From Swiss-Prot:
UniProt source species: Schizosaccharomyces pombe (strain 972 / ATCC 24843)
Glycosylated sites: 432
Topological domains annotated Cytoplasmic: 1-86, 151-156, 208-215, 268-349, 398-400, 463-486, 532-575
Lumenal side of membrane: 108-129, 178-186, 237-246, 371-376, 422-441, 508-510
Protein name per Swiss-Prot or TrEMBL: Myo-inositol transporter 1
CDD domains in UniProt: MFS_HMIT_like
Amino acid sequence: MSISSKDFQNVTSAGFADDTFAADTFAADKKSPFESSVFENKTQVLPVDSVSRLSNGARSRSNSNISLSEPHALNDTVEDQPVSKWVWVLAFAAGIGGLLFGYDTGVISGALVVIGTSLGGHELTNGGKEFITSATSLGALLGGIIAGALADFFGRKPVIAIASIIIIVGSIVQVTAHHLWHMIVGRFVIGWGVGIASLIIPLYLSEIAPSKIRGRLVIIYVLLITAGQVIAYGIDTAFEHVHNGWRWMVGLAMVPAAFQLFILIWLPESPRLLVKKERSQEAYNTLARIYPTAHPYEIKTKLYLIQEGVRDPFSGSRWQKIVKTFKELYFNPSNFRALILACGLQAMQQLSGFNSLMYFSSTIFEVVGFNNPTATGLIIAATNFVFTIVAFGVIDFFGRRILLLLTVWGMIAALIVCAVAFHFLPKDENGNYTSGQSNAWAIVVLISMIVYVASYASGLGNLPWQQSELFPMSVRGLGTGMSTAVNWAGNLGIGASFLTLMSEITPTGTFALYGGLCFLGWLGALFCYPDLTDYTIEEIGELLKHGFGVRESMRHLKRVRQERAWSREDKEQNN
């Protein structure tokens, strides 16, 4: 389907009188069932209120480089419409992959404490624990690299199904493990599934979400990650004293994976991917469900804008297209800045050390002297869950940038306090900690970790997963694949080095190191991270064309809030 900008501009320049607006719709080059019903050359009559939304909404769009005569200028009309509750149900259904992600990262913490001699007849060493945790990260790294290409080739829904199947297989391998390397293979396999899911689900949600709630929809995915971690710690606690209970811990990951496979039947495909695959009728139907009160013209306008955004700029063989896609990502300034932002945020998230706490919190609290380290770890997971809900409520109010810059300082302060507390914990002549949970410094360690996790969950735990919004459709699969690979590479490094760092440079040095890395990340965000709140995916590319757009994004956010305040005042006066 091909529609010229000239045809579109004829619509925007049409006049209107009294209560109606006459608009010539677009004539399609190809005749399809969709085009004959949506873009057939007919005259439509739109109510004045629809026209008002089209013109006023377009003129109020804050990007000063976009005029009413351009297609992008009309995008705001449908985005201003009420969103169907179906979108929220869809987000929770798709986000079950996040629950799997969280369950897998959380459950291993308790399992490592109780595996005992089940793997080969001898106790796990620190090296064995690091191998088990890092195998998942290595599998996820490789899965994340290929997930983007799989998503572009097969579609978003089939790849979610592939991830669920791989997780089920990995769970079975772990349950049947009787040797260390058998367990490592199972962790590696499940890592593939988790890595694929960690890319495809935020990508899917960002493509289907209206711009005004895109941040919150992606946070639902992160919220379900944290819910999975809470469930994992609860399962760990329940099976801690059961013979071979760790097999139940790792095996129960099959349940949500199987459930997600089942509900995929009712999930729609991404409208942007449907348009790219020339399945425009399905895309129209999906958008109509997302915006149930929107006028058909507004949905057609949205479809036109999506079509312009997903138009394949590359020609040639598949290999030539792959090469051109790499060049477009790395040599197009806008796309390369998007890649820097996405990879930088993912690296910042992992190098903050959070996942070392998820993987080894039970081990840490056992070292500190808590009598029930797994139950204590549940407090950490619950904190993560609660403050992810807080982030859900405030991300689109405060904006992404302010939220990130403020919460990272909470992480830094908590890590410094934790480092100091470890320094003052009593030790024996061999350097082993001898305090119990009644020791004041042990309590300080716990409180500082709670503050650290609360700060992380409110900002850095969520924002990197908004990465899909940074990339245009032409490089989205590759760009999100690269940034997700950075996430899992950092995760691999953290998981493989944490216990070694605790031994070699002491817990004080380890947590101080994480605090220093957080500060470096904060500096990078201060100078390079724009606030993308209320930008459509198509507009973000324009913002990044000539720089990182930090100042322009802040002006944009200020204008949007001012416009919303005026809109509320107008409604109050009209009432």
